[in-house]
């Protein structure tokens, strides 16, 4: 892949690391695979669920529940990770990055719920000039 992939772009993979059921892919197997990917030039792994079986009863659903797994993969495979799954608050996203559980947070549900989530998060976290997370044509008119 690296032979044809532009060097100026990161090479990332979203990988379902486990189905959290006996007999399915294990996190240890995923870490071994990620190490192989890294040796071939992978820059970042987006840690996700497997969804290879219909039974999701073993999944530990909850706020930011994949972040600890992203942290483990980041540590053991020594590769940057993206953490996602039910990251809803600015504080959750900030903690994941600050505590080095992930290098990037994925915000699908949060962004669907609030397309201006980055601006609201920046304001909540006290970021100066938070309005500039919005497009310039909007930010210009907002008073903070």
List each model region and its residues.
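Flavin-dependent oxidoreductase catalytic cores
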Residues: 2-144
């Amino acid at each position: 892949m690296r032979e044809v992939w532009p060097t100026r772009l990161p090479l990332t993979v979203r990988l379902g690391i486990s189905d959290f059921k006996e007999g399915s892919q294990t996190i240890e197997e995923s870490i071994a695979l990620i190490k192989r990917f890294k040796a071939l030039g992978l820059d970042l792994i987006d840690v996700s669920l497997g969804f290879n079986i219909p039974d999701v009863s073993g999944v530990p659903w909850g706020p930011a529940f994949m972040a600890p797994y992203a942290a483990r993969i980041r540590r053991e495979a020594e590769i940057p990770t993206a953490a996602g799954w039910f990251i809803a608050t600015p504080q959750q996203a900030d903690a994941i990055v600050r505590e080095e559980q992930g290098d990037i947070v994925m915000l699908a549900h949060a962004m669907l719920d609030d397309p201006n989530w980055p601006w609201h998060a920046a304001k909540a976290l006290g970021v100066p000039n938070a309005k500039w997370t919005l497009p310039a044509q909007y930010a210009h008119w907002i008073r903070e």
